[in-house]
Amino acid sequence: MTDQDRRRALIIESSDEIPRKSFLKRFPVPRNFGVAPGSRVRRGRQWPAPSGAKQPKTFQIYRFDPDSGDTPRLDTFEVDLDDCGPMVLDALIWIKNKVDPTLTFRRSCREGVCGSCAMNMDGTNWLACTRAIDDLGSPATIYPLANMPIVKDLVPDLDHMIAQYQMIEPWLHEKTPAPESERLQSPQERARLDGYYECILCFCCTSGCPSHWWNGDRFLGPAALLQAWRWLADSRDEAKEERLDTLE
């Protein structure tokens, strides 16, 4: 069984079988992220602008395939903005469709709802589908989220982040018998959840958190902590003391 298989197997194990306080001790943060020690990002291939392009923009994009045995590189692409949508994700799709089909990245909703296309653009973690190309410099630099192993190119391995999210048990805990109708909240109780339940688990915040960089085996990170508070603040939840004990 590979290390990745072990990580995935750990994620799907029932939390009842793993004491929550020891959960992270069984899930250490990988330190080399699949990159050889001392490796530097090297200059990669340069792809010219299409013939006749009147509004080209330069994108420098991180490329890395851990299975290839090669070191990371930055490929340079000239994107014709007249033939491309306004968002960074549009540019990535344009490159994949028209220049280099091997470029790998996540995307799904294209509406800022799913969190799949989170990446680092010009030094800032953002969703590629909501970041305008015009907001980036030239060249625009595109990297995967930091502090995570790389599956390929702009695709980070989220296993550790998901395991930390699972640890806080992000569902309603009930001790009293279920009512015949739904569990009601007052408007004021419901309003306490505003700003928390909207989290789409893109992990931009956790990727950019220095405390998580150095202590990810013990510190849950901002995304998981926000979700923990979301359930602590929920008037319907009946396991607040247990949740607080888990977070100690």
Regions found by a protein language model. Give the residues of each.
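Short, contiguous acidic and Ser/Thr-rich linear segments
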Residues: R73-P86
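Local cysteine-cluster metal-coordination motifs and their immediate loop/turn environment
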Residues: F59, D70, L103-D135, D194-W214
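Short polar catalytic/cofactor-binding loops
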Residues: I61-D67
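Short structural boundary motif marking the start of a folded domain
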Residues: A53-F59
